[in-house]
Curated annotation (Swiss-Prot):
GO terms for biological process: acetate metabolic process; L-threonine catabolic process to propionate. Homodimer. InterPro entries: Ac/propionate_kinase, Aliphatic_acid_kin_short-chain, Aliphatic_acid_kinase_CS, ATPase_NBD, Propionate_kinase. One of its GO terms (molecular function) is metal ion binding. Belongs to the acetokinase family. TdcD subfamily. This is Propionate kinase. Pathway: Amino-acid degradation; L-threonine degradation via propanoate pathway; propanoate from L-threonine: step 4/4. It is an enzyme of class 2 (transferase). The record marks 175, 236 as: Transition state stabilizer. Its cofactor is Mg(2+). Substrate binds at residue 86. NCBIfam families: ackA, PRK12379.1. It holds the Pfam family Acetate_kinase.
Length: 402
């Protein structure tokens, strides 16, 4: 066993690899970076926020070799005791994280048609890491597995049964690693018993989802079979009437593929504002009186509040509403507008606490008189993945979750 073991966390996207190296004893981040533009001539690697360096080899394997070389330069290569992989979709097969074996790889491949853009990239990352770090225990952490505790009435669609039985058409949910980490932290921050609690977690970023967590388990979530369902997002429409899209197709002669591009890439904040999918740009425009930017933000907020209230119905009681993700953690405007919408639930805002920057970390942003506590908890998916790897790999597990 390594004297000073570290965990390498790998997140292979459709054209990028994000990575972090964490100390196995306390999960402190020792280095991090991103390889982007994979499989293109513009592929580059940036480490610890430094200047991007062109990659000599543009494949996933080439990018991971470059990452391994960066570890070697810092004398960390031989310290890698565990590797944790973020896997986009585990289907109904994976209800929890798993040590990677040939059988696990085969099962990931089986469910990959459910998330072809990401799962096949995840598999490339696993295969390359096995070659670069032979003998190192690797762990798969699935974005969907936290939601496998949902009851059938929460995950089934009102479609003919054969589509579920034969094709696996159902709600799977995403952002599970984030929702799990944040709900665990919330129990500590709000002094709640994990086995007797009710939380609604709002992961708000360019992709966004809501999760109802009852007694530490996901019982409902807004994303569906794909990450398109639920909230309006940066470029995704979120919930939309299928009949409306069918009518658009009939009027414009667009194909299913065309419309899929529209609802995934051209809608949401970008679609309504006509300006940007970046909330920071839209907030600036909001204050400058840009009407469509204001309308985009109001629609975004309305959908968030409606989904939070709806997800509360899946709980026996509502102890807290937790904001996380890039927008949830950093936008005091969005939090304020959402909380104002939720006055019906007994939510009251503490303006001073809400206006504090994210550098303050975990914090309660509701007033002392509020019936429901609202809090901000920065997510840390890399730490959650590392903790799962440490737990399964039994390498000097940290004494405390925090």
């Amino acid at each position: 066993m390594n004297e000073f073991p570290v965990v390498l966390v790998i997140n292979c996207g459709s054209s990028s690899i994000k990575f972090s190296v964490l100390d196995a004893s306390d999960c402190e981040v020792l280095m991090s970076g991103i390889a982007d533009g994979i499989n293109s001539e513009n592929a580059f690697l940036s480490v610890n926020g430094g200047e991007p360096a062109p990659l000599a080899h543009h494949s996933y394997e080439g990018a991971l070799k470059a990452i391994a070389f960066e570890l070697e330069k810092r004398n960390l290569n031989d310290s890698v005791a565990l590797i944790g992989h973020r896997i986009a979709h585990g289907g109904s097969i994976f209800t929890e994280s798993a040590i990677i074996t040939d059988e696990v790889i085969d099962n990931i491949r089986r469910v990959s048609p459910l998330a072809p853009l990401h799962n096949y990239a995840n598999l490339s990352g696993i295969e390359s890491a096995q070659q670069l770090f032979p003998g190192v225990t690797q762990v798969a952490v699935f974005d969907t597995s936290f939601h496998q505790t949902m009851a059938p009435e929460a995950y089934l669609y009102g479609l003919p049964w054969k589509y579920y039985e034969e094709l696996g058409v159902r709600r799977y949910g995403f952002h599970g690693t984030s929702h799990r980490y944040v709900s665990l932290r919330a129990h500590s921050l709000l002094n709640l018993a994990e086995d007797d609690s009710g939380l609604v977690v709002a992961h708000l970023g360019n992709g966004a989802s809501i999760c109802a967590v009852r007694n530490g388990q996901s019982v409902d979530t807004s994303m569906g079979m794909t990450p398109l369902e639920g909230l309006m997002m940066g470029t995704r429409s979120g919930d939309v009437d299928f009949g409306a899209m069918s009518w658009v197709a009939s009027q414009t002669n667009q194909s299913l593929g065309d419309l899929e591009r529209v609802v995934n890439k051209e809608s949401g904040l970008l679609g309504i504002s006509g300006l940007s999918s970046d909330l920071r740009v839209l907030e600036k425009a909001w204050h400058e009186g840009h009407e469509r930017a204001q309308l985009a933000i109001k629609t975004f907020v309305h959908r968030i509040a409606r989904h939070i209230a709806g997800h509360a119905a899946s709980l026996r009681r509502l102890d807290g509403i937790i904001f996380t993700g890039g927008i949830g953690e950093n936008s005091s405007l969005i939090r304020r507008l959402v909380m104002e919408h939720l006055a019906v639930l007994g939510v009251e805002i503490d303006t001073e606490m809400n206006n504090r920057s994210n550098s303050f970390g975990e914090r309660i942003v509701s007033s002392e008189n509020a019936r429901v506590i609202c809090a901000v908890i920065p997510t840390n998916e890399e730490k959650m993945i590392a903790l799962d790897a440490i737990h399964l790999g039994k390498v000097n597990a940290p004494a405390e979750f925090a």
